[in-house]
């Protein structure tokens, strides 16, 4: 696919990009593509109208392993937007033991800050590399101190001609890797992070304590002896951190959260009330989680350590299998906040064939590449692919339907012997055909008891 500015991709281009990684589920791809394009459209509106246009949240309905999570994850990567995936079952009603739903937005803010900090470091990379080189050269060629009140920074800017010639020579050797094994002594910043365990529901307090201890130790450094090869990445990272303006990063990250953030809530069906015949304690608790989620989806202000995040324009994508519950079992207020409903279909044998061969990082390509590292040339005949897809479909039909994840189990079992013996088979070529598949898996597929526990 040609290079396209992802911010201005059309829905058709977004679907084509998703097709490179995910097989089928065209309706779901269309829905998320339109939602992403609507974000761009909204940003073109006058500010007064822009603030009135709310995102159309999406509810994905379909069995496990059909691509719900992968579609949302690929969409976030494509949009280069802050993205967080959570399970609805991890959260509890306020006042009970468990995670507070506002932690979702705090996690989103953490993701955004990390994303924008890395982008800022990429922008200053060249400058950071030059500074790191200067520090290495200073360690190799200490500058001559002259006079009272000698300023090494000023000396760095105005070196003598002899020093300059020597530094140019050493800089060239440094860039060519000729000095990589030389040991130097450097002042390196100390990482003051501390791991603090907190009880469930008190993660925010743990974060604040970690931040406090980190601030207490900031600015400290220690002398370390390192090879130039090991010191260089450390110094580049340290210098890039100095060049990045943290206030600008936080401001940009908060804005990105509010305008482009994507929250994927999995297993939303597990917090739906099941049936109409009376309410158990579990139903009451599940309804409480829904009511706590409601303000986030409707739009509210959430305090994070980087500032306040408004959730009005964050895109929420919820998903669930809805085997025991129906979308209508969600509380009406929450149903209304997910106006776009998309049903994902169960995968067939034909889908499994495509999953094994078509995506950019198809499973078969992954296993071929893994064994190639051992010098084993692995290839799959077309009849083997067909037989693998048939076996996966059969086992899914007879046992629990876990969708495409069944292919991982089947392939691991199929290649178990070959993976074990690969180091001893360097230089060999192995072709997997239908006969090989039947020899390795035939007995397991025919015996329902064995396939239940092994496949």
From Swiss-Prot:
The keyword Chaperone applies. GO terms for molecular function: ATP binding; ATP hydrolysis activity; peptidase activity; proteasome-activating activity. Disulfide bonds: none annotated. GO terms for cellular component: HslUV protease complex. ATP binds at residues 23, 65-70, 266, 333, 405. Gene3D superfamilies: 1.10.8.60, DNA helicase RuvA subunit, C-terminal domain, P-loop containing nucleotide triphosphate hydrolases. One of its GO terms (biological process) is proteolysis involved in protein catabolic process. SMART domains: AAA (SM00382), ClpB_D2-small (SM01086). Keywords: ATP-binding, Chaperone, Cytoplasm, Nucleotide-binding. Pfam families: AAA (PF00004), AAA_2 (PF07724). InterPro entries: AAA+_ATPase, ATP-dep_Clp_protease_ClpX, ATPase_AAA_core, Clp_ATPase_C, HslU, P-loop_NTPase. Its main location: cytoplasm. It comes from the Bacteria. Belongs to the ClpX chaperone family. HslU subfamily. HAMAP family: HslU. A double ring-shaped homohexamer of HslV is capped on each side by a ring-shaped HslU homohexamer. The assembly of the HslU/HslV complex is dependent on binding of ATP. This is ATP-dependent protease ATPase subunit HslU. It comes from Xanthomonas axonopodis pv. citri (strain 306). The lineage of its organism: Bacteria, Pseudomonadati, Pseudomonadota, Gammaproteobacteria, Lysobacterales.
């Amino acid at each position: 696919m040609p290079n396209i500015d992802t911010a201005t991709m059309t829905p058709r281009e977004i679907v084509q990009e998703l097709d490179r990684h995910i097989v089928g589920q065209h309706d779901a791809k269309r829905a998320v593509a339109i939602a992403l394009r609507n974000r761009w459209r909204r940003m073109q509106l006058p500010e007064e109208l822009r603030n009135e246009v709310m995102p159309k949240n999406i509810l994905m309905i379909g069995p496990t392993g059909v691509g719900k999570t992968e579609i949302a994850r690929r969409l976030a990567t494509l949009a280069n937007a802050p993205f967080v995936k959570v399970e609805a079952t991890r959260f509890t009603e306020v006042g009970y033991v468990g995670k507070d739903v506002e932690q979702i937005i705090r996690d989103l803010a953490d993701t955004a800050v990390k994303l924008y900090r890395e982008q800022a470091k990429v922008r200053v990379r060249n400058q950071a590399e030059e500074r790191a080189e200067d520090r290495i050269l200073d360690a190799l060629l200490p500058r001559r101190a002259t006079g009272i009140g000698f300023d090494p920074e000023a000396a760095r800017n105005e070196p003598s001609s002899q020093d300059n010639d020597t530094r140019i020579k050493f800089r060239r050797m440094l860039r060519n890797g000729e000095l990589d094994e030389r040991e130097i002594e450097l002042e390196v910043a100390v990482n003051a992070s501390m791991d603090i365990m907190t009880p469930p529901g008190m993660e925010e307090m743990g974060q604040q304590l970690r931040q406090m201890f980190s601030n207490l130790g900031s600015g400290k450094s220690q002398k370390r002896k390192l090879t130039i090869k090991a010191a260089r990445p450390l110094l580049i990272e340290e210098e890039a951190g100095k060049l990045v303006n943290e206030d600008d990063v936080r401001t940009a990250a908060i804005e990105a959260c509010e305008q482009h953030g994507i929250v994927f809530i999995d297993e939303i069906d597990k917090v739906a009330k099941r049936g109409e015949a009376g309410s158990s304690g579990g139903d009451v608790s599940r309804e409480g989680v829904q009511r706590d989620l409601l303000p986030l989806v409707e739009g509210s202000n959430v305090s994070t350590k980087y500032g306040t995040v408004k959730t009005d324009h964050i895109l929420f994508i919820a998903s669930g299998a809805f085997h025991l519950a129906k979308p209508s079992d969600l509380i009406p207020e929450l149903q209304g906040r997910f106006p776009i409903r998309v049903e994902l279909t169960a995968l067939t044998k034909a889908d499994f064939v495509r999953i094994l061969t078509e995506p950019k990082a198809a499973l078969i390509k992954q296993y071929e590449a893994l064994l190639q590292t051992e010098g084993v040339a692995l290839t799959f005949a077309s009849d083997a692919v067909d037989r693998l897809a048939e076996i996966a479909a059969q086992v899914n039909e007879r046992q629990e339907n876990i969708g495409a994840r069944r292919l991982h189990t089947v392939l691991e079992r199929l290649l178990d012997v070959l993976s074990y013996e690969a180091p001893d088979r360097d230089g060999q070529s192995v072709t997997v055909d239908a006969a090989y598949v039947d020899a390795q898996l035939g007995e397991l597929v025919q015996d329902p008891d064995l396939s239940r526990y092994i496949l």
